[in-house]
């Protein structure tokens, strides 16, 4: 069904090939998982399959890609819209509407589907994906995980033969990941062909037919899923991959340097958007210097809203936020706390990774640029230091934003889903 024959590709402006002599054949109804370290070429392969390469992303390409025997160079992406549906790593980049209902029906409207058929398919999508609670919502009010769910719904509504999913679990909570697993089992039972680019592997156990490991733009190794499942956790880690089995996190006992003055404290805090009901309220907690606190909960429960409120990007509805026992207005909190956002695209501004980190030192008297080299080395970004941040993979962007945070002299560092785009090696 999908045949990639000796394909090499280099993005326009890239210093080296992003794919090298790739050979990959995918049968109808097969579920193939692409995995490997950030920047290994997984997303590039998905763009070959959905024909964004060579029709949207410019570069030098050799070799051939064919879908059902048709060379993708001879057809446009819209010619395959009935056959292929894609969910991008960043769902925001594929939205065309302002609300969830319009987004789900957008593709069907563009196909000129009869109204009653479109309405039936829309209602079927809500029902089968269990997303009735997201009906009629403003897309800008959704959490990252909810946006990812709507992006999947808009593709599912079109009923394509091939689903191309680029890190579909990256913004999902454990419950939503299990729901994604249910959906993948559903479309696999319908005979759909599924290509998944992922770092998280455990939820694909029992769904995947093949695991394909990418490294530096090459297909390093391929396993039948049954053979991959026989690898020990240690062998999987040696490959730089996350576990194929669910793991239980054991937190070490850590005693923070506690004194009587909390670094940050919230009192009877209510957070949310001005025109709506609070996302969360009656929040009371303290965080002391040296303490690491994890905030967990379902998608849409208010984790990101709390993070934005603590650092002053969003104003609280009620209550108080105190830094070192002093109430701090939202506008002044920006100097107290630094947030690494769920979507790092929002906070990358310069023309290179090095300049991005240098910018973090701009308001500091002692601009020790050696710290930049140390951070680049620590985050495995040294070889990318002259690259434009927008040309990086999702995980590389995430690490760049984390590097900026490490160089800031903020009293409190807040990380919103910092591991979402990271492979095992860089997560460690």
Regions found by a protein language model. Give the residues of each.
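Conserved ABC ATPase signature
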Residues: 138-142, 146, 388-392, 396
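ABC ATPase NBD Q-loop/coupling interface
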Residues: 64-79, 320-333
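Catalytic Walker B motif of ABC-type/P-loop ATPase nucleotide-binding domains
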Residues: 163-166, 413-416
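Conserved ABC ATPase "signature" region
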Residues: 116-134, 367-384
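The feature captures the beta-strand-to-loop junction immediately N-terminal to the Walker
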Residues: 35-37, 296-298
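H-loop/switch region of ABC-family ATPase nucleotide-binding domains
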Residues: 198-199
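Helix-to-loop junction immediately C-terminal to a conserved catalytic motif
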Residues: 50, 311
